[in-house]
Curated annotation (Swiss-Prot):
Keywords: ATP-binding, Cell inner membrane, Cell membrane, Membrane, Nucleotide-binding, Translocase, Transport. It comes from Paraburkholderia xenovorans (strain LB400). One of its GO terms (cellular component) is plasma membrane. The complex is composed of two ATP-binding proteins (SsuB), two transmembrane proteins (SsuC) and a solute-binding protein (SsuA). It catalyses: ATP + H2O + aliphatic sulfonate-[sulfonate-binding protein]Side 1 = ADP + phosphate + aliphatic sulfonateSide 2 + [sulfonate-binding protein]Side 1. The gene is ssuB2. Residues 28-242 form the ABC transporter domain. Part of the ABC transporter complex SsuABC involved in aliphatic sulfonates import. Responsible for energy coupling to the transport system. This is Aliphatic sulfonates import ATP-binding protein SsuB 2.
Amino acid sequence: MSIDFALPQDAAIPAAAEERVNRTPLAVSVRGLQRRYGARVVIDALDLDIREGEFVTLLGESGCGKTTLLRALAGLDQPDAGQIRAPERPSVVFQEHRLLPWATLWENVVLGHETTIGRVGATRALAEVGLSGREDDWPRNLSGGQAQRVALARGLVRDPALLLLDEPFAALDALTRIKMHGLVKELVARHHPGVLLVTHDVDEALTLADRILVMRSGRIAASFHPKNHTPQALRPILLEELGVQSH
C-alpha cells in the first residue's frame, strides 16, 4: 500500500521534478507498520517514505494514531509488526521543551553528545536559533518560545537525517508561532533533514509542508502537495478530510 494517493484535486508532479525527488536519499522508510493496544488497532499496515529535505506534516483527529506513529519512528514505542528503516536515530522535538533545569543551555543542546559536539557545536547551534551569547544561561530564564528554540537547536545540532516534531508550537502564542514557523523553515533549508510534523493546525500545515498527509483510523487517508494548490483552495479540502465544516 502506498500512502501518497493520487487524489483528483492534486495535479501531477512534473516528470523532471519527480525524478529529482526520487534520487534524494530516504530519511525513513516504513512498511506494513502495525501497532495494537489490546484489541484496538492504532496503526494499521501503514507505509511511509520521507526523503531528506522533505517537510511532511501529518494531520488527523485525536486518537487516529499520529503520535503513536511518531513515537514508533523515534524508537520510543515498539510496533507489533512491520519495518522502519532509517540511516540513523532521528531527533525529536516535543510540545514540551524538556530542557533540564539544572543544566545550562549549551549543556542541554549537547545532551548525550557532549564528547562529539561539545561547547563549540552548541554555541553554533544556539546562534542559529537566535540565542547567541546565552550559552551559560538557565532554562528558567527563557520564555516559552526561547525554550523551544533551544529544543530545536538540540534537535538539529548533530545534523540528523530525520527530524520529528510533535506539535512543538501548540503552547505558544500566535505571534511566537509565526516567528517559529519562519525559523523552522530556515533551519530545515539549511540542514536538509527529512521532517515529520504532527499537528492539529491546518494553517500550520499549509505554511510549512511540502506534503500534507491526513491520518484516519491508523491509516494514511489522503496526501496533498500544497505547491499544486492555492492555500485558499486546499484549506477547505483538508478541513473536509478532517470532518470539519469549512463554512
